[in-house]
Structures are given as structure tokens and as C-alpha cells.
């Protein structure tokens, strides 16, 4: 299995403040995690980085967003699972941006 890290920015809730709850982002993370586990992968870590101001506004669905909820997920899976995760994130209207980074081919590459 290969180690990956997923970074994602989701739109803030309609009444978002800097301390808003990350439930929208965590629901998306659960959907991605379920896809990983269904394909015999392992989710190592899910981290919420909170609501942050974006470097430049992101336009999506005829709206402009200056803030976004940032989160990341570290996981082991087969390379074919990436396409399923990308499909989930592409179809989710709350996702502003995402990126999947390959961290290591095997455990010995990390040491």
C-alpha cells in the first residue's frame, strides 16, 4: 500500500465565524474515509486546521469565498482508490479545492 495525504478546503457554513463547527468538513472526511476503508485502506490521521483566510478569493458556483475550512487526512491505500476519492470530492459542492499528495511508496521510504 502507498501512503497519501489529502488536503482539502471546504466552504465555510453560511453563518461561519472563526470558531464555527467543522461538521461540513468532517462529513466530507467521513465519506472519503469510508471509501478508503471499503477498498481495504487504512486512515491514519484526520486533522482539522480550522477556518482560515484564503490567500486569494476562490470562485465556485457563482460565489466568491475569502475564508475556507482547511483539513487533511493521512491514509494508506492502493493507487486505484484515488480516483474514487477524487470523484467524491469533485461531486461535493462544498469542496473549494483539494490535493492528494503521495508521501511514500512503502514504509521504508519514510525512515
UniProtKB/Swiss-Prot annotation:
Keywords: Mitochondrion, Ribonucleoprotein, Ribosomal protein. Transmembrane segments: none annotated. GO terms for biological process: mitochondrial translation. It is found in: Mitochondrion. Pfam families: Ribosomal_S6. One of its GO terms (cellular component) is mitochondrion. GO terms for molecular function: small ribosomal subunit rRNA binding; structural constituent of ribosome. CDD domains: bS6_mito. InterPro entries: Ribosomal_bS6, Ribosomal_bS6_sf, Ribosomal_S6_plastid/chlpt, Transl_elong_EF1B/ribsomal_bS6. Belongs to the bacterial ribosomal protein bS6 family. Component of the mitochondrial ribosome (mitoribosome), a dedicated translation machinery responsible for the synthesis of mitochondrial genome-encoded proteins, including at least some of the essential transmembrane subunits of the mitochondrial respiratory chain. The mitoribosomes are attached to the mitochondrial inner membrane and translation products are cotranslationally integrated into the membrane. Component of the mitochondrial small ribosomal subunit (mt-SSU). Mature yeast 74S mitochondrial ribosomes consist of a small (37S) and a large (54S) subunit. The 37S small subunit contains a 15S ribosomal RNA (15S mt-rRNA) and at least 32 different proteins. The 54S large subunit contains a 21S rRNA (21S mt-rRNA) and at least 45 different proteins. This is Small ribosomal subunit protein bS6m. It comes from Schizosaccharomyces pombe (strain 972 / ATCC 24843) (Fission yeast).
